[in-house]
Amino acid sequence: LQLQQLQEQNESNRTMLECWTVLSSLVPLTRRIKLGAILVNLFRNPAIVAKMASTLDNISNGRLEFGLSAGWYQKEAEAYGAPFPSGSARVEMLKESVMILRKMLYSDNNNVNNKSNISFKGKYYNISNAECNPKAVQKPHNPRMALHFTPR
């Protein structure tokens, strides 16, 4: 087994555990497999996702891979109280999220205390002096991020 990957979207009635919690529980039980998550961008603030990704990448010694989906399953978004804007707006939200994630996970803007504080002002997301320290273990641009755009 090379990669254990979990997703958030569930359009069936099967049991599906929350992916970040499950992946965290696998860290001490495994040593080599990559740990992957496919996240719905609508469900979490990208600054929080960056902090979660950095944490999991650090405690797993660089084994995290994750993907982001613009979101396509309206019923699920509504069930969790998440917004479900038009397809083009979801894609724009995803683009802003990727900009924030890249800045927070990989930037080298270190201040006097060797910490990176990131600010971003966009149409959908605004963060001010958000910290993501320590940075992701993997270099140069990992954990790997895959994007998922949908036609809906």
Q: Could you describe each region identified by the protein language model?
A:
Residues L1-R152:
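Active-site-adjacent structural elements that line small-molecule/cofactor binding pockets in enzymes
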